[in-house]
Amino acid sequence: MRTGLFLSSFFFFFSIISTYAGNVELIKVTGKVIDALESKPIEFANIALYSADSVFVSGVNSDEKGNFSINCNDLKNHYLTVSYLGYETQKVELGISKNNVRTHDIALRPSSVQLKDVVVTADGTFKKIDRDVILPSEIQLKTSTSGINLLQNLSLPRLIIDQVNNSIKLANGGEVQIRINGILSEFADVQALQPGDIIRVEYHDSPGLRYGNAEIVVDFITRHKQSGGSVNAELHTNPFNGFTNGSFNLKFNHKRSEFALSGFTSHRDLDFMRKSEESFVFPDGKPALSRRIDGEKTPFMQFYISPKLTYSFREAGKYFFTASFRWASNNSPYAYQDVKGDVYNNDELTGNMYRHDKFRFKMPLLDLYYQRELKNKQIIILNAVGRFQEYKETHSYKERRGNELMTDIFYTEDSKRYWMILEGIYEKNFQNGAKLSAGLKHTQMYNEIDNKEKELITVGQNQAESYLYTEFQQKLGKFNYSVGIGVSRNDYRQGDVKEIKFTYRPSLKINYNFTDNIYARYNVSVYNRTPSIYSMNPVVQNIDSLRFRRGNTNLDTYMTYQQVLSAGFKKSFFSADLRIDHRYQDKPIMNQLDYVDGRFMTQPYNQKAFHHLQGELTLKFEPIKNRLTVGFVPGILRYISEGNNYTHTYTQWRFSAFLNANYKKWMLNIQLWDRYDYFQEETLYGGETWQDVNIGYKTDRFSIFAGMINPFKDWNMKSHNWSALNPSSSNTFSNNVSQMPYIKISYNISFGRQFKSVARKVDNTGGEGK
């Protein structure tokens, strides 16, 4: 304490002497010091100004809001050192200036010896009660070209970064929520993030009740700049066929405000081929029919664009407001489901068929978000989202024998959907490390569907859900726990159908840290699933001459019971993460095939049960810290599907691997993902065998990568249906996405005052309070 007072007094009197020694116009250097983990202001941090040859010029302490101000005669490659007891010292280079300068928020990283409520691993990961907090290293930030690329370099368990399909996904198809500063975001938003603006990444592998049904939540916490801005753009394309992704982002900062304009576009013009075999077993005694389709190349075309305008206003440690408007448009004149080919009935060529679907949609969205930090570690969050979607789809199926048209089906579906989402969240952190959170979320949706085949049929649907939850978590030594309960009120109305139901969602999480390197975690949760609007559409839709489908207005909500056991170990350059996930669904909604009036009808029903067991082990090696990471991911899948008139089981063993390496300005990334088969109802949906190999070169402003998709194995997807009435198998493949080369180019410019922060591993300047 005496040392701190002495240093403060020393800095104060030295500043007075150095400031008023001469009658010159002074330059003011201002900024704010925050905690990198919590984004809270740090009071009494020591800020020292040094000349280019490391001569001490002046020093001050930050105030209760983390702000500081230092006066000096000139700035010629001067730099700041910022330190505080229990934190790593930061160095901020100021460059040359004759005007007053304002640094970005200076985020200090806590040192491991001062952390009481978290477990710290060697790679800068802080294991808190409800999430892992990852502080990217300087090398990881420097070798990343965007927020997406940084996420890939972090190699977080279970996440698959699919830059071809523009998604961050799980192998099992579960929901991944992407957030930026707590606000729900999309792939394009993360693509627009500059790595240097990212303070930390928060990884929730067992999200709390506020996140709904998400299996993983990734939240990027960014710093706020007081001035200047940036422009960046990226192009990801195959120069030989129709594959292009493009993004653009413009940001401008002025004091507490930030203005941003971003855009993302995607274009596909590819060819796919399908071959299928199926049998029709007629219960009325007709001879069984064996049918084969030998497909030819069929085009798939898609144009997607999504511009976004954002304004945010914030003061760290007090409040944060953001308003964003997004417009999304997608036009697919040739759908992925299209197929054209010869038809063989009982091995005899009988003609040809052509299925052609096309769709387009447009969706404006307005998102308002407000966060207020109160006294005594309390936070209030308010969020309002309004969204409209107009969707148009046409389906055409034609089958010919020679010049004779045997089957001609054509129908259209036009829908207009209106959403309003209102949410309020309250959080309270206690001195003992405990945390209480509660929230109320209301979703109101209206959907109007116009179906037209021979006549126009209009269906109006109203659906509302109110969700109230509370959750409490606490750390007791090496033991962490979280307990919560959620209550949902679901209101569904369609014509004369009216249903109101209440469901409950209890949740329990237990975590035990055996040592700083070993942990185990167990989670159990219960939640309900409501029928989708599409599944309750009663209108008949013809598929071909033998099949049709329709929804079911008598569908009921069903419960899902999920248990997750996970454990992890990390020591030096090696880490292992094990996850065993069991999900049981009671009376789930699954399709059923019946024979009705001489045709086969697909209709959803509440079936008996569905079981899904998944085990996955992620082994990660880092023989050269921050330079070389190698990972192996073996796993097993087990399914049991129990319908009202069928039972099927399926087991799959799978194996994946990845490698990330960098040397100076060169980078190498390899991803080898085995197919993830998914079985539900009576159908096995084969996943994609996906490989991505790329090598690149990056400077501070420019980067270029060259790579290849699926260099070692041709791309294909298979499916099998085990129905007793209509067993089938199909195979989809494409030469366009097999051995597909691509290039990825990015360029960014920063303007205005820019400052570079460097974490100091060794501090020999002295007198900094550490």
Please provide the spans of the model-predicted regions.
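Short, acidic, small-residue-rich periplasmic hinge/interaction motif at the N-terminus
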Residues: 34, 48, 83-87, 101-141, ...
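A short, solvent-exposed loop/turn motif at the edges and junctions
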Residues: 52-55, 79-93
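Periplasmic plug
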Residues: 160-206
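Transmembrane beta-strands of outer-membrane beta-barrel pores
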Residues: 235-239, 254, 265-269, 325-331, ...
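Outer-membrane beta-barrel signature, preferentially recognizing the C-terminal barrel domain
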Residues: 516-518, 528-577, 584, 602-614, ...
